[in-house]
Amino acid sequence: MSFRSLLALSGLVCTGLANVISKRATLDSWLSNEATVARTAILNNIGADGAWVSGADSGIVVASPSTDNPDYFYTWTRDSGLVLKTLVDLFRNGDTSLLSTIENYISAQAIVQGISNPSGDLSSGAGLGEPKFNVDETAYTGSWGRPQRDGPALRATAMIGFGQWLLDNGYTSTATDIVWPLVRNDLSYVAQYWNQTGYDLWEEVNGSSFFTIAVQHRALVEGSAFATAVGSSCSWCDSQAPEILCYLQSFWTGSFILANFDSSRSGKDANTLLGSIHTFDPEAACDDSTFQPCSPRALANHKEVVDSFRSIYTLNDGLSDSEAVAVGRYPEDTYYNGNPWFLCTLAAAEQLYDALYQWDKQGSLEVTDVSLDFFKALYSDAATGTYSSSSSTYSSIVDAVKTFADGFVSIVETHAASNGSMSEQYDKSDGEQLSARDLTWSYAALLTANNRRNSVVPASWGETSASSVPGTCAATSAIGTYSSVTVTSWPSIVATGGTTTTATPTGSGSVTSTSKTTATASKTSTSTSSTSCTTPTAVAVTFDLTATTTYGENIYLVGSISQLGDWETSDGIALSADKYTSSDPLWYVTVTLPAGESFEYKFIRIESDDSVEWESDPNREYTVPQACGTSTATVTDTWR
């Protein structure tokens, strides 16, 4: 078998493969490759089996393998929660091989929640606000910006997502006995401490942060619904969620979202882009109150934040207001001399992909006085009004926004390494990667942006019933319940349908049918849901190929459409061999393809000397499924 792809991920790039990757023709094909790279990299950073994090305990998500300049070899509750939410969404959309990773994470959090630390302990709940821990599940006792109050909310959201899947698939006792007690601890923390100051997600400002408040509101809303679903209740969620939403409105300045109170900075910060995308609800309208991605407030803020970086990075010189630029944390940043971050640039793209989804779902978009400047920068003829999806103006605006969004991802493509690796930052002048290598959050950001680009969205968190702002805000808190949880073992869970079991993109995890079709010796499975939903415009198609190879050989996928290189071998999509065994010589790749697209394809074998061997005729044929709720499909082939 060939370890060539794996070696590339660990930095040992083979010249032939590097040349192939460097010739990627389109953003689509790059993203198809990069999504596989990102998923593998995330798993490489999770203990105990992660290839890059030897010594990390099982289920511990390590921020980066970097141990010096800077030392990020720790686990942050915030980063871990965001990363696991990404994996949970992938799992619910069909990647069932992630089950053990999710279980190990939850088991690890049962231990982490109980660790006494400089912020406190579990008995008072205060210890849940500790930002980071050692990778061996012990307290980090050095000086740090603590507490950080976003972590418990994000961890709750990640676990609720998995808990809901358990409920939808008949594992009620597991959701009730294992997941709910851990979620309850985090919800109790949010309800008790949300109105106290803490450090922001960048660990620098001690005050009140938009990102923190936004994700806390979301957690309590979906936490209350989850409590009901497991036969319990969360009165502290119900009493505090409206008050948090009320307070959230105070971050709106009239022209942009203020990132932090108690800060001398301008307040323009990617914090607010991240807050919007991590509270995105695919069922929501363009609500200003929750700063939904398509809301006038969020769009106006997007322009203000992005524009704040146009003149301060050499990389952005000469780019017009209608062009994407490299995006950092905030314009006053001095960490590593202040540079763009991969995850911030991707957040700018993801918000726009979210907005495109919301406009498409509601069948119109609205330009208001608040959002007009955003639209005019991209479409000079924009004027206030509501535009139906059947209008030419709607089409022109949507095309401009999609191009703008893709521009941010293209910047990420430019500065990612040839093997797909992404650090924390890239230099504002020459684009070279900086700071911690292989940042786990960078890879999670790539996966979520790519999914949103392809209309693959997470489950609703209940925004539609939680967007009404109280007439008067009250600075309150509520006491919940804290309890120590020990996870000794998990029951046997069968994620039916192999790698193609999926929840609908709009929320339900109840899979009711699996259909199979065949075409030219290819077995195809797709997954659908019985609930009402939208039809995604793209489907994540996994190509599984059984092919025995020798060391130095690699397998690529080529075909008659641009996403598969238009038959150009140099633009083929590399398959991964990280699951290859002598008894099961599996090569695979997941490619996002337009729903309903019909095409021909073949696999090719590239030798160590870069010579190409085509499999035998005839060409294989495939039509991407296009149906309500169908977001994934799998094609099973054998080399011939």
Swiss-Prot record:
GO biological process, one term: polysaccharide catabolic process
GO cellular component: endoplasmic reticulum; fungal-type vacuole
EC number: 3.2.1.3
Extent of Polar residues compositional bias: 628-640
UniProt propeptide residues: 19-24
Entry keyword set: Carbohydrate metabolism, Cleavage on pair of basic residues, Disulfide bond, Glycoprotein, Glycosidase, Hydrolase, Polysaccharide degradation, Signal
Keyword Disulfide bond: yes
SMART domains noted in UniProt: CBM_2 (SM01065)
Entries under PROSITE patterns matching the protein: CBM20, GLUCOAMYLASE
Pfam families, A to Z: CBM_20, Glyco_hydro_15
Catalytic residues as annotated in Swiss-Prot or TrEMBL: D200, E203
Chain positions recorded as substrate binding sites: W144
GO MF annotation, one: glucan 1,4-alpha-glucosidase activity
Recorded catalytic activity of this chain's protein: Hydrolysis of terminal (1->4)-linked alpha-D-glucose residues successively from non-reducing ends of the chains with release of beta-D-glucose
Domain CBM20: 533-640
Ranges where the record places region Disordered: 498-533, 616-640
Cleaved signal peptide residues: 1-18
Residues of this chain annotated as glycosylated in UniProt: 195, 419, 465, 467-468, 476-477, 483-484, 486, 488-489, 492, 496, 499-502, 504, 506, 508, 510, 512-515, 517-518, 520, 522, 524-532, 534-535
InterPro entries in the cross-refs: 6-hairpin_glycosidase_sf, 6hp_glycosidase-like_sf, Carb-bd-like_fold, CBM20, CBM20_glucoamylase, GH15-like, Glucoamylase, Glucoamylase_active_site
Residue pairs linked by disulfide bridges in the UniProt entry: C234-C237, C246-C473, C286-C294
Family: Belongs to the glycosyl hydrolase 15 family.
Protein name according to UniProt: Glucoamylase
Organism: Aspergillus niger
Gene, per the UniProt record: GLAA
